């Protein structure tokens, strides 16, 4: 075996061993110590992160991709399933980022969840999730990818419903798992199609043997899977609802790692779809619709976590647009930069929520810049990175995506929607900063404001550094697989920046108008549309079940009762027998002439029958 391959497979084995060790210690019947989460879990993830840097440096030095197949799981005459790992730039870059972000979030969770009696179990769930995510990222066949896919799904369900005493948390967890189940149908059907038509689940073999086939059907299944997992329009309501879980869960699963699994699936299998115009157009239009719709919903939300959740969904839509543009590497770059600042925004939100007695309404915050200067500064940095401010992390990916979109010869409507959503990103980001950091405090004086704990400061600080320099580091060290546009007109080059600045100006105007409005709640249709999330949950979660119940009630009470019990049952017997009864009773009238006539007729009939 080549030494590079040996080192890569050994490091992955070490990462899995380090992450599994804390889980194995929990099998001991004696209960864990109070600080087990910090001594075992956090240390294991930190060590795994440091180990994962080794393959990254080797890859930077040599630039070689490696596939390691070490164990045959199952085989038949035409089909085999191996344990196979793929070390390409997607898995080698994303694994350290996932470990780094998780390390920061778990340290924050040790402060955020310190009063929870089951904190050790919470950390165990997060660790299981991380293992499933790394399996998904490094998988080289659909079977392993499916194991990781379902693993992150079930851990998401358990962690959203962590506070299971609350009805909202249970509903949100069920909602998440049902929407994901719809997406999983697409993935399972695609896997079945690949197994029956290509006789292989190995990704390289699938690429090689599918060149002559029409892949529209399985690609639509994969897009459905990505729509469910990455909260694209139609299957998006679960992501804002998932904010019922603890803030560390929102920061890890529902912003930086799990929700990008759907996009990652499409990036990993992109060679299948790069020449299929139907699939690419579907991705482009679906992504553009998602990014604008969810950005519109974020404009009027007042729950700080919901705003950040909708911004996540909006950025996932932008990644889907990028896949539709045939630029998977740019989508992956945006995944990497987005992980840092979005996780940091959630941690800053969690810190502020905790400091204000669990208050999540931004209208009841304000003036936090003087009270929690570090957290507020990082919240501002994260918001600026999200809007694509030049030379922060988000700029390098977002600007490249908008450039690729501007210079492509594709759907102009998708371009318009995406640029409008980019402008809205600036609006809701500045709105959060305005309501949370600026102005005067609008909360009770008894709020226990405290940001002196290193478990709060250090994770946010690490992610802040990532939000500032990650984009520069990644773009300066990796060559793009497709040559970017070298020259373009100045207006096109500045398009992303101009719409962002216009969004910031609109946000400032709106924020100042907020203090001058006469009615507390606007009655505009547009405001209601945005605030009610486009009436989507009301229609899908309320109207559809109501119509189903009404239909069921109609079938049960009217169709079954009236048809079976009345028309066919007792009343039916009466209605069928009544004509015969009336006919026979009319015949028996006591008239001798009639009887005599009938007697002669019947006698004559009998004689005729005997004669013939």
UniProtKB/Swiss-Prot annotation:
Keyword Ribosomal protein in record: no
InterPro entries in the record: NADH_DH_su5_C, NADHpl_OxRdtase_5_subgr, ND/Mrp_TM, NU5C-like, Proton_antipo_N
Record GO terms (molecular function): NADH dehydrogenase (ubiquinone) activity
Keyword terms of this UniProt record: Electron transport, Membrane, Mitochondrion, Mitochondrion inner membrane, NAD, Respiratory chain, Translocase, Transmembrane, Transmembrane helix, Transport, Ubiquinone
Entry EC number(s): 7.1.1.2
Main localization, broad class: mitochondrion
Membrane protein topology class: Multi-pass membrane protein
Known function: Core subunit of the mitochondrial membrane respiratory chain NADH dehydrogenase (Complex I) that is believed to belong to the minimal assembly required for catalysis. Complex I functions in the transfer of electrons from NADH to the respiratory chain. The immediate electron acceptor for the enzyme is believed to be ubiquinone.
Broad enzyme group: translocase
Organism the protein comes from: Salmo salar
Similarity comment: Belongs to the complex I subunit 5 family.
Transmembrane segments: 4-24, 48-68, 92-112, 122-142, 145-165, 176-196, 215-235, 247-267, 279-299, 307-327, 330-350, 376-396, 410-430, 463-483, 494-514, 591-611
A biological-process GO annotation: electron transport coupled proton transport
Protein's name in the database: NADH-ubiquinone oxidoreductase chain 5
Subcellular compartments: Mitochondrion inner membrane
Catalyses which reaction(s): a ubiquinone + NADH + 5 H(+)(in) = a ubiquinol + NAD(+) + 4 H(+)(out)
Gene Ontology terms: cellular component: mitochondrial inner membrane
Keyword Iron assigned: no
């Amino acid at each position: 075996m080549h030494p590079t391959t040996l080192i890569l497979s050994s490091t992955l084995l070490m990462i899995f061993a380090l992450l599994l060790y804390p889980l194995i210690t929990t099998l001991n019947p004696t209960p864990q110590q109070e600080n087990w989460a910090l001594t075992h879990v956090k240390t294991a993830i930190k060590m795994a992160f440091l180990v994962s840097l080794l393959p990254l440096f080797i890859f930077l030095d040599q630039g070689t991709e490696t596939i390691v197949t070490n164990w045959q799981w199952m085989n038949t005459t035409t089909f085999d399933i191996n344990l196979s790992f793929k070390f390409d730039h997607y898995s080698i870059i994303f694994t350290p980022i996932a470990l780094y972000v998780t390390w920061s979030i778990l340290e924050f969770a040790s402060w955020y969840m310190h009063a929870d009696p089951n904190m050790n179990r919470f950390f165990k769930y997060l660790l299981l999730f991380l293992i499933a995510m790394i399996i998904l990222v490094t998988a080289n066949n659909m079977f392993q990818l499916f194991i990781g896919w379902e693993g992150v799904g079930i851990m998401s369900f358990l962690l959203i419903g962590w506070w299971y005493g609350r009805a909202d948390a249970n509903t949100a967890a069920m909602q998440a798992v049902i929407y994901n189940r719809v997406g999983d149908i697409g993935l399972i059907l695609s896997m079945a199609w690949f197994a029956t038509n290509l006789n292989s689940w190995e990704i390289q073999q699938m690429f090689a043997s599918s060149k002559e086939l029409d892949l529209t059907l399985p690609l639509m299944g994969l897009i459905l899977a990505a729509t469910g997992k990455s909260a694209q329009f139609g299957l998006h309501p679960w992501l804002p609802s998932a904010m019922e879980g603890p803030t560390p869960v929102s920061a890890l699963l529902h912003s930086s790692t799990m929700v990008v699994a759907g996009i990652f699936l499409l990036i990993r299998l992109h060679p299948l779809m790069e020449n299929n115009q139907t699939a690419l157009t579907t991705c482009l239009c679906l992504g553009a619709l998602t990014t604008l719709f969810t950005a519109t919903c974020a404009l009027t939300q007042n729950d700080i976590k919901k705003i950040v959740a909708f911004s996540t969904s909006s950025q996932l839509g932008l990644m889907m647009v990028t896949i539709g543009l045939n630029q998977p590497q740019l989508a992956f770059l945006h995944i990497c930069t987005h992980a840092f600042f979005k996780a940091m925004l959630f941690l800053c939100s969690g810190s502020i929520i905790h400091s204000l007695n669990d208050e999540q309404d931004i209208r009841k915050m304000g003036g936090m810049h003087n009270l929690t200067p570090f957290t507020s500064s990082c919240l501002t940095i994260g918001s600026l990175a999200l809007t694509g401010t030049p030379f922060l992390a988000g700029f390098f990916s977002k600007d490249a995506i908008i450039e690729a979109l501007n210079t492509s010869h594709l759907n102009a409507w998708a371009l318009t929607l995406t640029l409008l959503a980019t402008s809205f990103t600036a609006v809701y980001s500045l709105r959060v900063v305005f309501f949370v950091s600026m102005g005067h405090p609008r909360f009770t004086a008894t709020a226990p404001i405290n940001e002196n704990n290193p478990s709060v400061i250090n994770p946010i600080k690490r992610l802040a550094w990532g939000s500032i320099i990650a984009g520069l580091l990644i773009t300066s060290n990796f060559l793009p697989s497709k040559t970017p546009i070298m020259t373009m007109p100045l207006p096109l080059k500045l398009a992303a920046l101009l719409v962002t600045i216009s969004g910031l100006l609109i946000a400032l105007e709106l924020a100042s108008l907020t203090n001058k409005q006469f009615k507390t709640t606007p009655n505009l249709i547009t405001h209601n549309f945005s605030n009610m999330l486009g009436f989507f949950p009301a229609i899908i979660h309320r109207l559809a079940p109501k119509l189903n119940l009404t239909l069921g009630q109609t079938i049960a009470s009217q169709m079954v009762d009236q048809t079976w019990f009345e028309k066919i049952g007792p009343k039916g017997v009466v209605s069928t027998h009544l004509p015969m009864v009336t006919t026979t009773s009319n015949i028996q009238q006591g008239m001798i002439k009639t009887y005599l006539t009938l007697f002669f007729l019947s006698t004559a009939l009998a004689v005729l029958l005997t004669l013939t």
